[in-house]
A protein has these predicted regions:
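Phosphate/anion-contacting hairpin/loop surfaces
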Residues: 64-174, 179-186, 191
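Gly/Gly-Pro- and Ser/Thr-rich, intrinsically disordered tail segments characteristic of DNA damage-repair
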Residues: 1-112, 185, 270, 289-293
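Low-complexity, intrinsically disordered/propeptide-like segments
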Residues: 13, 17, 122-125, 222-225
């Protein structure tokens, strides 16, 4: 599933390509035919994101809400648009660009009230300037749930996925099994500042890199026999010599590195199924504290 930085990057791309002009809207697949007919030829006023949710604002307060889910893609290409192939749920067209949406979990026309109802369910988004991290801190510190689950809860922090969850916890030496109520405010504040920086970097690069520059050569040496990543969130985007060396690994400390040595302590990185997703951590660097009952 695309993480929040990818959806923000997509929103910026669509905004720069289509905002401020009438667009052709169609649904070659047919599942969005009624919505497309309502919007066809109207002005797309802007595109923005909150967490993993994409919003396309059209005139007369109409909003298309898109959630890509696990398999959705929304790809922009230069015009002219070819004949649609495959299950294209939504196509946007302008004289210069077209964009095809395939396989989303959600694609619906909403009003402003509908958008507000979705945002009510979401926590603060680290990539939004109006984000209030204190809302996330209060939810975390008021919970007995483990941090490995809380960071994936979109009502706590919007936009984090499996990669950022694993890497953020490792970078701050927090066990994924630590209860939220055990977290110190200073650690939560440091984690928030860190994830803001990591996600902004992800928007800029077009890929997730969480390994500090001074540790990249050591990690690449540990993973020299490992195939390049096939995860679109980890590969692609900015291509530099330093990042090409990381193609042998993933540019991450623990994510998808189970069974391999931790670059910081040498212990074997572990993984297990946790709440429906794969969880990665270093048992030595991320020891769980005891919590009084």
């Amino acid at each position: 599933m695309p993480e929040g930085h990818s959806v923000h990057r997509l929103a910026r791309s669509l905004h720069s390509s289509f905002a401020g002009e009438p667009v052709r809207v169609s649904s070659p697949q047919g599942r969005f035919a009624a919505g497309a007919a309502e919007l066809d030829g109207t002005v797309l006023e802007g595109a923005d994101a909150w967490g993993k949710h994409l919003f396309l604002a059209f005139d007369r307060d109409r909003v298309v809400h898109v959630h890509l889910g696990l398999y959705g893609t929304f790809v922009r290409e230069p015009a002219p648009a070819p004949e649609a192939r495959g299950a294209v749920r939504l196509r946007l067209e302008s004289p210069r660009w077209y964009a095809d949406l395939r396989g989303p979990t959600a694609c619906d026309v909403l009003g402003l009230d509908g958008r507000a109802a979705i945002l009510e369910r979401l926590g603060p988004d680290p990539l939004r300037r109006d984000a209030d991290p204190e809302l996330a801190f209060a939810r975390i510190r008021g919970s007995r749930a483990p941090m490995g689950g809380l960071l994936m809860d979109q009502s706590v922090i919007a936009g984090l996925g499996n990669i950022y969850r694993a890497e953020l916890l490792f970078r701050h030496r927090v066990s994924p099994f630590t209860e939220g109520r055990a977290m110190r405010p200073a650690v939560l504040a440091a984690m928030w500042d860190d994830i803001v920086g990591l996600m902004r970097d992800g928007v800029r690069r077009g890929r997730i890199v969480t390994v500090e520059p001074e540790e990249r050569d050591a990690l690449a040496a540990l993973d020299v026999d490992r195939p390049a990543s096939d995860d679109p969130e980890l590969d692609g985007g900015e291509d530099t010599l330093a990042l090409r060396r990381l193609r042998r690994s993933t540019g991450t400390y623990v994510y998808r590195r189970d069974g391999r040595p931790c670059v910081r302590c040498g212990s074997t990185v572990r993984a297990q199924d946790f709440q429906g997703r794969r969880l990665y951590w270093c048992p030595r660097c991320q020891r769980a504290p005891r919590v009084r009952r």
